[in-house]
Amino acid sequence: MNEPSGRVVLVPGLGLDARSSARLRERLPADVVLLPGMGLAQPVPALDVLAARLRSDLGDGPVVLVGHSQGCQVVAAAAVDPRVAAVVLLGPTTDPRMRSAAVLARRWLGTVAGEPSWQAPLVAVQWWRTGPRAMRALWRAASPDRIDHRLARVPVPVVVVRGTRDRLCPHDWAVQVCAAAPRGRLVEIPGAAHMTVQTHPDDVAALVREASRSSPRGVRRPPESP
């Protein structure tokens, strides 16, 4: 099996930690970066500070950045780094329509209904570890941020992935996110909901490998002008 050309770095979703990607990492060598609100019960700084913390963990590169759910927002903000060779966004959740609590609750319940029940204890223990305070703070920091503006400045391949049963990342929103990236591509996984990193690890691993091969090994982009 071909491995990615370069290091894979994963950023988990809201309240989640490395356990959310354990099944994926059995199939794909990858490193997980935990951040406040995403596995760490720490005060959540501004989104650009979170992105800077992620960039400090990238090493020499090239790197394939993979974000899940709210982690997509941090990945999009960090992806202008010249060490990033490709980006995979699993279920980005900053659809402006979800700033309404009623819409968010309705979509969350609809998505939960489409998830396998075996995930519930695993997700609950991760949320407990991260804590509601950090999770709320991350949502407030990330949800107003314009991911389309971020991705417009990302020249590397960007693969947007959603499950066909994911109401937190509906089809029209995923299309909009994909269109914002100069080299964006949308992939929908049939029957999956929001937790594709956990429920469909084979599909996600294949997409990460494909994204990594779409950028030549060792490519370095020049640093951006200040």
Question: What is the meaning of each model-derived region?
Answer:
Residues 76-115:
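Flexible "cap/lid" loop of the alpha/beta hydrolase fold
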Residues 153-154, 160-162, 166:
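Short beta-strand/loop motif that positions the catalytic acidic residue
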Residues 2-40:
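Conserved HGGG/HGGXW glycine-rich cap/lid loop of the alpha/beta-hydrolase fold
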Residues 66-75:
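Gly/Ala-rich beta-loop-alpha elbow adjacent to hydrolase catalytic centers
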Residues 165-169, 194:
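Acidic catalytic loop of the alpha/beta-hydrolase fold
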Residues 120-149:
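Hydrophobic, aromatic-rich cap/lid helix
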Residues 156, 170-179:
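Short alpha-helix in the alpha/beta-hydrolase fold that links the catalytic acid
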Residues 192-205:
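Catalytic histidine-centered segment of alpha/beta-hydrolase-like enzymes
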